[in-house]
Design a protein with these regions (language model features):
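Small-residue-biased structural context
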Residues: 1-138
């Protein structure tokens, strides 16, 4: 059986980074610390890699081996959705270097708001839907 403690701890760390970035992009443009944003995007990326590795190694294999077709279907849905979201995040992360943010601040702020909102929604959905199923299956 899978312990949700580590996944929830990872979510907390990821949400801290998302919240920091959300707060930073809400500042007046002249007050935004681009170096700090780049640092926290890197930190978020590392946390996401660890989280996804653990999900793909431990969480999803258990859910996909469930006797319950609904559980397997839900797991497949979450795998597909996360794949799409990670692709969007990767494009965002690779698009915006420090130089590019300076050159295209308005585009960066718009894209960052969209990506951060989608990420927060995803992790809330995991906790509210996926983790409840895992608890019920246990």
């Amino acid at each position: 059986m899978i312990s949700l403690h580590n996944f929830k701890r990872q979510h907390n760390a990821i949400n801290e980074e998302l919240s920091f970035l959300e707060t930073e992009i809400q500042k007046e443009k002249v007050l935004i610390d681009i170096s700090d944003i780049i640092f926290h995007i890197g930190k978020l990326t590392a946390l996401l890699r660890i989280h996804l590795l653990e999900e793909n190694t431990n969480l999803y294999p258990e859910l996909l081996s469930s006797q319950d077709e609904g559980v397997r279907s839900l797991a497949n849905q979450f795998i597909m959705e996360m794949g799409e979201l990670i692709n969007e995040y990767t494009i965002f992360k690779c698009t915006y270097s420090e130089k590019r943010i300076n050159e295209k601040m308005d585009d960066f702020l718009k894209d960052a708001e969209q990506v951060l909102k989608a990420m927060k929604a995803r992790f809330t959905k995991e906790e509210n839907e996926l983790y409840h199923v895992l608890t019920a299956v246990a």
